Amino acid sequence: MEEIQRYLQLDRSQQHDFLYPLIFQEYIYALAHHHSLNRSILLENPDYDNQLSFLIVKRLITRMYQQNHFIIFANDSNQNPFFGRNNNLYSQTISEGFSFIVEIPFYIRLIPSQAGKGILKSYNLRSIHSLFPFLENNFSHLNSVLDILIPRSVHLEILVQNLRYWVKDVSSLHLLRFLFRESWNCNPLIATKKRGFGFEPKRSQRLLFFLYNSHVCEYESIFVFLRNQSSHLRSTSFGVFLERIYFYGKIERLVEVFAKDFRASLWLFKDPFMHYVRYQGKSILVSKGTPLLMNKWKYYLVNFWQSYFDLWVHSGRVYINQLPNHSLNFIGYLSSVRLNPSMVRSQMLENSFLINNAIKKLDTLVPIVPLIGSLAKAKFCNLLGHPISKPAWAGLSDSDIIDRFGQICRNLSHYHSGSSKKKSLYRIKYILRLSCAKTLARKHKSTVRAFLKRLGSEFLEEFLTLEEEVLSLTFPRASSTFRGEYRSRIWYLDIIYINDLTNFQ
């Protein structure tokens, strides 16, 4: 953020949000490459010499507005290998810098102003770490849940309209439209069959991640506005959404599906115990309300997507579950509310009687079937969960093979340490342990039985530790009773940095 403040002269940008001139600045692409998670396409081109000048950017933008791309590349491919190597390289080049530039208006609003307004307060923004206290403290007291899959296919023009408030110069919006069309035509992996623009996280670049987040932010801003049943929002960060172009016109269009009276429509969804949680492309609405209220919310969400985003959303994308009877697959856990029966003896004068009492308790389980499917996809076992060797790693040294298997096992154990039952996790450890043994036996051209017998019981001892070692570091002076109490469920705050199973492939 300090680099942006130093180079971009935020005082002038903050007044008009004119971003188009920044496209012609060389340092923009250096900053974009520095902050981007993916390597820049330009830096991988050996003929480019790791530079992007004003003249090249101007030529790229000029070529983008030509009507016949084939004639241009046919004439210039022999003269300029930079443009002739890949037909859509120019649009990807501009996309690298434009994805960084279009985020500037969002960065500006997160910077405390120098006029003494202080730090921006946001009451409705929460991190992933707030999910765990929510599960522990509130989940067991709720009854119904709406399991929502956020639609990922959005019309191109709707994405541009969502950014009209943040990016006000017309040139940048036209350039954004062109980049959309190029991505739609050149990359079928991110284009839907009809008119929508699909988001594939593993295939997307930084611009697509930003567009998807802005789309979800737009969806949540109006959703939270209607949820709060107020003409203004409590959070300062959400207040800017009330000033968007045609905002109130969109609100009136939304409520037409329920009734003409705006206040009467909002009263139908009044619920003081409604909780909204989103993680990646999935969100949940949890409430103490009746099934009738949850059906109203389901009907509202389907019509909300169809009327505001012009999306045909099937009602099957929103599931209604009762927590005491169903499990919720969320953030890698199968969460449910389990009734823990208990019996209390009560005595009044000379009479004594027994009272049956059921206490609701949060139950988090490891989803064994999806994990086995992930292991099978990564070639650690078959679909039935039987361990197999990893031929791709057979050429590594013994220590490297053990380290890779051990790292995956530690990551899984660390992430699923919040599970209340560890039996499924032990099965996953067993699969990885035996797969490692089979890989080493394959390398040394031996059988697994002979290989394990030769190494003894000390082989792969790191697969059997993990929770106990981490717990001893977390609570070094705790008693055995205290440690036993916390061994059942521990939420670690660094699980978002854990690599998945496919990182070593």
Swiss-Prot record:
<dbReference type="Pfam" id="PF01348">
    <property type="entry name" value="Intron_maturas2"/>
</dbReference>
<dbReference type="GO" id="GO:0006397">
    <property type="term" value="P:mRNA processing"/>
</dbReference>
<keyword id="KW-0694">RNA-binding</keyword>
<comment type="function">
    <text>Usually encoded in the trnK tRNA gene intron. Probably assists in splicing its own and other chloroplast group II introns.</text>
</comment>
<protein>
    <recommendedName>
        <fullName>Maturase K</fullName>
    </recommendedName>
</protein>
<dbReference type="Pfam" id="PF01824">
    <property type="entry name" value="MatK_N"/>
</dbReference>
<comment type="similarity">
    <text>Belongs to the intron maturase 2 family. MatK subfamily.</text>
</comment>
<dbReference type="InterPro" id="IPR024937">
    <property type="entry name" value="Domain_X"/>
</dbReference>
<dbReference type="GO" id="GO:0008033">
    <property type="term" value="P:tRNA processing"/>
</dbReference>
<keyword id="KW-0934">Plastid</keyword>
<keyword id="KW-0507">mRNA processing</keyword>
<dbReference type="InterPro" id="IPR024942">
    <property type="entry name" value="Maturase_MatK_N"/>
</dbReference>
<keyword id="KW-0150">Chloroplast</keyword>
<dbReference type="GO" id="GO:0009507">
    <property type="term" value="C:chloroplast"/>
</dbReference>
<keyword id="KW-0819">tRNA processing</keyword>
<dbReference type="GO" id="GO:0008380">
    <property type="term" value="P:RNA splicing"/>
</dbReference>
<dbReference type="GO" id="GO:0003723">
    <property type="term" value="F:RNA binding"/>
</dbReference>
<dbReference type="InterPro" id="IPR002866">
    <property type="entry name" value="Maturase_MatK"/>
</dbReference>
